Every structure is written in C-alpha cells, then in structure tokens.
Swiss-Prot record:
Higher taxonomy: Bacteria, Pseudomonadati, Pseudomonadota, Alphaproteobacteria, Hyphomicrobiales
Physiological role: Catalyzes the NADPH-specific reduction of 1,5-anhydro-D-fructose to 1,5-anhydro-D-mannitol.
Subunit structure: Monomer.
Keywords associated with the record: NADP, Oxidoreductase
Name of the molecule in the record: 1,5-anhydro-D-fructose reductase
GO molecular-function terms, A-Z: 1,5-anhydro-D-fructose reductase (1,5-anhydro-D-mannitol-forming) activity; nucleotide binding
Length: 333
C-alpha cells in the first residue's frame, strides 16, 4: 500500500484526489496546512490521521511514501524539492513551477534521487481523449492538420481567490487552464508545440493585471495548428476538442472537464459514428498509474517532463499575449 501525504489542504484534494488515492488502494496518512486550525479540521473532515504545519514535518514522516502537492503555484518548486530530498515520490499540480529553470530542476532532482515525479494533468486520463489519440494513431482521420480547443468555463465562487488577484502566485487563466490544453493536445496528437500567438483580456474577474480570458493558436512540430479559447467568465459555454485531418474529423463535446463524461464523433466521407468510450474516474486512473510507476511498472499518466512542456507552452502564451508577437516554445529539457 502506498501511503500519501497531502501538501496543501485543498479543494481539489478533498473533491477528487483523496477519494482517488483510496480507490486505487492507497492511504492518506497526513496533511500539511500552514494553518494548524485549518489542517486539523481538514484532517477530521476527511478521515486523515495526522495534520502538520510544515513541509519538513510531512516529508520527514517515515509513514509517508508519496506526496501530492496542491498549494499555490509559487510554492510547488520548493515543496517538491524538499519531498524529493526526503526520498518521497511526488505528484504535483500544474503548473509545476513559475519558471522553466525551476521546473527542469524538479525533473532533474527526481531523476537523481530515483523517485517518481508526476504532473496532475488529469485530462489525458479521460476516455474521450484516449479514444481520440488512438483514432488518430490508427489513421482514421488521415494526417492531422488542425485542432480546436474550447475550454472557456465559469470559475465557481469558492475558487475565486488567488487565481484572480495574485500574480505572484501564478494566477490568471493561462497558467490555470491553457496549460491543460497544451498537455491534452500533446497527448492526443502525440506531437509537441513549437510556437504560440495569443490575445488575452480581463472581462471583469481578473484583477492586478491578471487575464481571465485568452484566445490563441499553437503551431506543432508536424505543422498542425491548434486554436484555443480559455476563460473563467463564461457560465454557459460548452467545452470541446476537435481534431481535423485530411480524411476525417474527430468532434469531442463536453470533454474538457474533471468528470468522466463527454462524447467523440468520427466524421468522414462515410458519415458520422460515435466512438465507444469506457468512462472512468480520471483521477483514479491517474493515481493507479502513479502507484504502478512507483512499483517500477510504466510511468505516470503525465510525467515531470510533460509538466515542463505544458509550463513552457503556458509561459510562451503569456509572453505572446503581452508582446503581441509569435513566441517560440522551448523547454530547456
């Protein structure tokens, strides 16, 4: 059994990850919050035996094998390195870090320590995206030439905090949502982005110069161009992912979501057909793969390197939106 410590008494851990760890046969043994009162209440609410107030206390606990980091973005790098130094496996929320040097250091140190580092890019675990990846690899749409991502959502009131008003914490829609688009596109297309252009704005939610909406285009190594629209402000939009090829199109609807839902339609000269899907909890799939990787079987659903790629893409989109120019995507890996 893999025993987990939570770095951050977060909403995502409470709503998704704690249950996924338990469903995958693991146990959550400790939670760290800088507030002792919050940590103790969170532990009691979620059936966790220990609550601590420092990262060192959590990663120094011999009962902890792996940590899940879901604090604000500027804390990820230091907390991950502390866990890696202590010999703990690390599953970290995106973005891995605030800059590429820190992200690459996390990957390097995990490799040197012989521990597993994963990025919690949940969307590549969706049955919809896996079916699209398989269909493309099988040649069912011919050569991919373009893609479109619709990932404009409404940020619920209980999450309308640092994402909207703390630039120093890595707030804004690009580092929160666009990084997911980048990872999903890399996974589905089995291709890497090399260039970004974008325009961002604030429609009233984003403060302190932070964007709450962005549209842009990524150019991939193969020549595919991918359009994306991300926002915190759209209450009634539908999410989706489309990939268009020389011999067909894949139309994914309601697929950019944490829930195991959505449909994928293959459209070609023969007509339309809905791809069969085996919907499963995305986070349970991710944790099961992470447990297997700890045991020496396979790799995490999204590795540390995958997290660096999505970070590099997000940072390029931020720069492109700020400068109005095309920005090359380089990872430093």
């Amino acid at each position: 059994m893999i025993r987990w410590g939570l770095i951050g008494a977060s909403t995502i851990a409470r709503e998704w990850v704690i249950g996924a760890i338990r469903a995958a046969g693991g146990e959550v043994v400790s939670v760290m919050s800088s507030s002792a009162e919050r940590g103790e209440a969170y532990a009691a609410e979620n059936g966790i035996a220990k609550a601590v107030t420092s990262v060192d206390d959590l990663v120094g606990d011999p009962d902890v094998d792996a940590v899940y980091i879901s604090t604000t973005n500027e804390l990820h790098h230091g907390q991950a390195l502390a866990a890696i130094r202590a010999g703990k496996h690390v599953l970290c929320e995106k973005p891995l870090a605030m800059n590429l040097n820190d992200g690459c250091e996390m990957v390097l140190k995990a490799c040197e320590a012989g521990v597993v580092l994963g990025t919690n890019h949940h969307l590549r675990n969706a049955a919809t995206h896996r079916a699209m990846r398989e269909a493309i690899a099988a040649g069912r749409i011919g050569r991919p030439i373009a893609a479109r991502v619709f990932h404009a959502v409404y940020l619920p009131p209980h999450l309308q905090g640092w994402r909207l008003d703390k630039p120093e914490a890595g707030g804004g829609v690009i580092l929160d949502i666009t990084v997911h688009d980048a990872d999903t596109l890399r996974f589905v297309l089995n291709d890497d982005p090399i260039e970004a252009v974008a325009i961002s704005h604030s429609a009233g939610m984003g403060k302190e110069g932070l964007e709450d909406g962005v549209m842009g285009v990524l150019r991939f190594r193969s020549g595919v161009i991918a359009q994306f629209h991300d926002a915190f402000t759209t209450k009634f939009a539908e999410t989706g992912l489309e990939v268009h090829g020389t011999a067909g199109s894949l139309i994914g609807r309601n697929v950019m979501t944490q829930r195991p839902v959505g449909t994928v339609v293959l459209r070609n000269e023969e007509g339309e057909s809905e791809l069969p899907l085996d919907h499963r909890n995305l986070y349970e799939t991710a944790i099961a793969a992470f447990h297997s990787a700890i045991g020496g079987n396979g790799r995490p659903s999204a590795s540390g390197e995958d997290g660096v790629w999505s970070l590099a893409t997000g940072l390029a989109v931020v720069k492109a939106a700020a400068t109005g120019g095309a920005v090359e995507i380089e990872t430093g890996l």
